[in-house]
Amino acid sequence: MSAEALADPKADPLAGPNPDADPEAINLKAIAALAKKLLG
Protein backbone atom coordinates (compact mmCIF):
# COMPACT_ATOMS: atom_id res chain seq x y z
CA MET A 1 0.00 0.00 0.00
CA SER A 2 1.24 3.47 -0.82
CA ALA A 3 1.95 6.15 1.74
CA GLU A 4 -0.88 8.19 0.26
CA ALA A 5 -3.32 5.31 0.71
CA LEU A 6 -2.18 4.88 4.31
CA ALA A 7 -2.54 8.60 4.94
CA ASP A 8 -6.02 8.72 3.38
CA PRO A 9 -7.84 5.38 3.74
CA LYS A 10 -10.95 6.78 2.04
CA ALA A 11 -8.93 7.29 -1.13
CA ASP A 12 -7.66 3.70 -1.18
CA PRO A 13 -9.57 1.69 -3.81
CA LEU A 14 -8.63 -1.52 -1.97
CA ALA A 15 -10.31 -0.32 1.23
CA GLY A 16 -13.73 -1.23 -0.15
CA PRO A 17 -16.90 0.81 -0.52
CA ASN A 18 -16.99 4.01 1.49
CA PRO A 19 -20.12 6.20 1.45
CA ASP A 20 -18.06 9.29 2.26
CA ALA A 21 -15.71 8.82 -0.67
CA ASP A 22 -16.35 10.00 -4.23
CA PRO A 23 -16.03 7.04 -6.63
CA GLU A 24 -14.66 9.25 -9.41
CA ALA A 25 -12.00 10.68 -7.10
CA ILE A 26 -11.08 7.15 -6.02
CA ASN A 27 -10.72 6.09 -9.65
CA LEU A 28 -8.53 9.09 -10.45
CA LYS A 29 -6.31 8.41 -7.44
CA ALA A 30 -6.11 4.72 -8.32
CA ILE A 31 -5.09 5.56 -11.89
CA ALA A 32 -2.53 8.08 -10.65
CA ALA A 33 -1.09 5.53 -8.23
CA LEU A 34 -0.90 2.92 -10.98
CA ALA A 35 0.82 5.39 -13.29
CA LYS A 36 3.35 6.18 -10.56
CA LYS A 37 4.08 2.47 -10.15
CA LEU A 38 4.48 1.92 -13.88
CA LEU A 39 6.63 5.00 -14.42
CA GLY A 40 8.69 4.49 -11.27
From Swiss-Prot:
The record's annotation in InterPro entries points to: Mastoparan (IPR013213)
- Keyword RNA-binding in annotation: no
User: Which positions does the entry assign to AXPX repeats?
Assistant: 7-10, 11-14, 15-18, 19-22
Its annotated compartments are: Secreted
Principal subcellular localization: secreted
Give the keywords, sorted: Amidation, Antibiotic, Antimicrobial, Fungicide, G-protein coupled receptor impairing toxin, Immunity, Innate immunity, Mast cell degranulation, Repeat, Secreted, Signal, Toxin
Query: Propeptide spans which residues?
Result: 8-25
Q: Which Pfam families match?
A: Mastoparan (PF08249)
As recorded in UniProt, coiled-coil segments are none
Q: Where is the signal peptide?
A: 1-7
Tissue spec. comment: Expressed by the venom gland.
Positions carrying Leucine amide are L39
Q: What top-level branch of life does the organism fall under?
A: Eukaryota
**Extra remark:** The primary structure of this mature peptide is identical to that of Mastoparan-VT1 from Vespa tropica (AC P0DQZ4), and mastoparan-M from Vespa mandarinia (AC P04205).
Q: What does this protein do?
A: Shows mast cell degranulation and antimicrobial activities against the Gram-negative bacteria E.coli ATCC 25922 (MIC=6.0 ug/ml), the Gram-positive bacteria S.aureus ATCC 2592 (MIC=3.0 ug/ml) and the fungus C.albicans ATCC 2002 (MIC=12 ug/ml). Exhibits little hemolytic activity against washed human erythrocytes. Its mast cell degranulation activity may be related to the activation of G-protein coupled receptors in mast cells as well as interaction with other proteins located in cell endosomal membranes in the mast cells.
In Swiss-Prot or TrEMBL terms, this protein is called Mastoparan-like peptide 12c
Please name the source species: Vespa magnifica
